[in-house]
Amino acid sequence: RPEELSAAFAEAKAEAQACFGNDEMYLEKLVLRPRHIEFQVLADRYGNVIHLGDRDCSVQRRNQKLIEEAPARCLTPELRERMGAAAVKAAKAVGYENAGTVEFLLDPDREHFYFMEMNTRIQVEHGVTELVTGVDLVRQQLRIASGLALRLRQEDVTLQGHAIECRINAEDPVQGFRPCPGRVDFLHFPGGPGVRVDSCLYSGCELSPYYDSMAAKILAYAPTRMETIRRMRRCLEEFTLEGFPTNAELSYQILYHPEFILGECTTAFLDEHLSELLEFSRKLSESGVDAVSYTHL
């Protein structure tokens, strides 16, 4: 709370002095209900740096992304250009060489954005960028690592269509997203035009409890955002995994929520709406109908 800031700051200074012999402190701006917007960059050892557009990763639980999409619906062309230029400038400033992601927080007025971090690797959600740009990011990363110069120039990068990714995690949203690894008794992934699935699972395999709970990534692509949303809904209708709980049903319900359809989700979305989403699922479960089947009917 604001009234506690002064005392907390003094306490933190004392702790820093006691632990590290240095009580220097800095303050970061608190951005309430921001959007999580990130830019994919490629940089070679010859100083060539480009960005491949943006991703909106605001639908999260415990600061871990659940649904990602490209491009971000909330960005104007002017803001996209400014944020992309900032991402490229940041990568150049540190002499970066690799594929990477520059992540920002965008405040509610959609005018001011703040650097959060840079992920110096290929990210889980890189597939949505590949779908809207047609650029194979892993191939580009291997070329960079081999010492080759980027062939792509910024003017070569165009964003076409819309892509959405849903992470399928072995976890139970009803139990506070408790990890639920185990044996895959039966598995069926969706398919068809504009659908991509990245996973190593198969019927009969064991999902280990010793690693991340993510079991698969389902991606959908179409010419427009609404078409992509409909395609992803169909993907989650077709997806079947028997053996342990996943978050697939929750993601399916999110795709029907008005805030998601309008592109208005912030990082606070699940905190604000999880109870109602789970309550809907619970009522259907008590009636003997799962949410996916209900909505499909």
Residue ranges and their predicted role:
Residues 26-31, 36-43, 95-123:
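Conserved metal-phosphate-binding beta-hairpin within the catalytic cores
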Residues 87, 127-297:
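Catalytic cores of soluble metabolic enzymes centered on carboxylation/carboxyl-transfer
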Residues 1-32, 62-76, 82-95, 149-152:
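Conserved ATP-binding module of the ATP-grasp superfamily
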Residues 3-14, 81, 85-92, 116, ...:
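Solvent-exposed alpha-helical segments within well-ordered globular domains of core cellular machineries
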Residues 12, 37-39, 101-104, 128, ...:
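Short beta-alpha junctions and helix-cap segments that line functional grooves
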Residues 41-43, 54, 106, 120, ...:
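Flexible glycine-/small-residue-rich
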